[in-house]
């Protein structure tokens, strides 16, 4: 199979027939063998009924229904697990991503040898309340990830070599930074293609609000930390813990040595426990020990942890 199109969705019933018809036309015009995987992420507006109707009309349509809304990352990951095509295309269901871009994205993967190609919505039809934070996000993501040639990390329209989606785990809210996940997995040939951005035709965006932007930055910092220290938590926690314990131990030793010297020379000296420095040294030793144990436990957890996605599938077609 040439192409798998993975479409995560939440309450997009109005747009689904038009979305599939557009994809179907592009696929037929270019002679691609394909499948379209709709991942219904807990929709409450009848989206699943529409997907079932599309499935009855076309063997190319597959559907996955979650028991509740889990988020875009688990929906994408579930679609990736089911995808069979040599090239996997992701796009949103809201008609803002153009299926006419599929042939160009496919060629960049198959003929130019890219592992991942991300769309770049150079001209956007979003309000400034969304575009301005997006620019800040992308600038920060480029800096932290080291992927200098991408301008739109969160673009829903992307193309992947099949091996990429089978070797990354998209969990939490990490869908924004899939190129970073791919790079960390060893897929370094990452490209970009300027794509059309359509104005939303049906409904309103489900992803507005301050929390979206705050969570985006927190996710990026989490991803940086995990990619740097995730395999060896002891490297960071053990190091910090050892430094703090050593400083506390040296301070306590000096306080004790000073007390013994004063006793040996019959110099009046208050009790060690009366000194605030003693408690400061003790606190540093305790915190150092806790950090060291945190690193140890982190190592154990990282070795025993497996899949971090806990979504439940209610039905598949």
Regions found by a protein language model. Give the residues of each.
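A conserved acidic beta->alpha catalytic loop
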Residues: 40-49, 95-96
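Short, well-formed alpha-helical segments that are part of the catalytic scaffolds
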Residues: 12-27
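Donor nucleotide-sugar binding loop of glycosyltransferases
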Residues: 12-15, 43, 98
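Hydrophobic helical membrane-anchoring modules
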Residues: 180-317
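Short beta-strand/loop segment that forms part of the nucleotide-sugar
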Residues: 32-43, 64-65
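Acceptor/aglycone-binding surface of glycosyltransferases and processive sugar-polymer synthases
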Residues: 53, 62-68, 72-82, 87, ...
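Cell-envelope/extracellular polymer assembly enzymes that use nucleotide-activated donors
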Residues: 2-4, 35
């Amino acid at each position: 199979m040439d192409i798998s199109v993975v479409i995560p969705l939440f309450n997009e019933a109005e747009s689904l027939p038009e979305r599939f018809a557009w994809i179907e036309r592009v696929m037929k015009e270019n002679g691609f063998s394909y499948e379209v995987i709709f991942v219904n992420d807990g929709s409450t507006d009848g989206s699943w009924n529409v997907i079932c109707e599309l499935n009855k009309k076309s063997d190319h349509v597959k559907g996955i229904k979650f028991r509740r809304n889990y988020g875009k990352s688990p929906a994408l990951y579930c679609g990736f697990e089911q995808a069979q095509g040599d090239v996997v295309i992701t796009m949103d269901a809201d008609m803002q991503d153009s299926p006419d871009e599929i042939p160009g994205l496919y060629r960049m993967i198959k003929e130019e040898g890219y592992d991942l190609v991300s769309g770049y919505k150079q001209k956007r039809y979003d309000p400034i309340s969304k575009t301005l934070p997006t620019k800040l996000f992308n600038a920060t993501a480029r800096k932290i990830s080291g992927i200098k040639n991408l301008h739109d990390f969160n673009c829903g329209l992307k193309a992947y070599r099949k091996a990429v989606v089978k070797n990354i785990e998209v969990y939490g809210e990490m869908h924004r930074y899939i190129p970073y996940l791919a790079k960390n997995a060893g897929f370094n040939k990452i490209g970009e293609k300027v794509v059309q951005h359509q104005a939303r035709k049906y409904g309103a965006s489900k992803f507005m609000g301050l929390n979206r932007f705050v969570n985006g930055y927190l996710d990026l910092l989490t991803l940086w930390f995990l990619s740097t220290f995730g395999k060896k938590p002891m490297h960071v926690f053990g190091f910090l813990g050892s430094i703090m314990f050593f400083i506390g131990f040296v301070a306590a030793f000096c306080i004790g040595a000073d007390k013994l010297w004063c006793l040996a020379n019959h110099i009046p000296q208050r009790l060690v426990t009366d000194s605030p420095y003693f408690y400061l040294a003790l606190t540093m030793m305790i915190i150092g020990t806790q950090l060291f144990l945190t690193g140890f436990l982190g190592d154990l957890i990282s070795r025993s942890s497996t899949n971090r996605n806990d979504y439940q599938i209610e039905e598949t077609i």
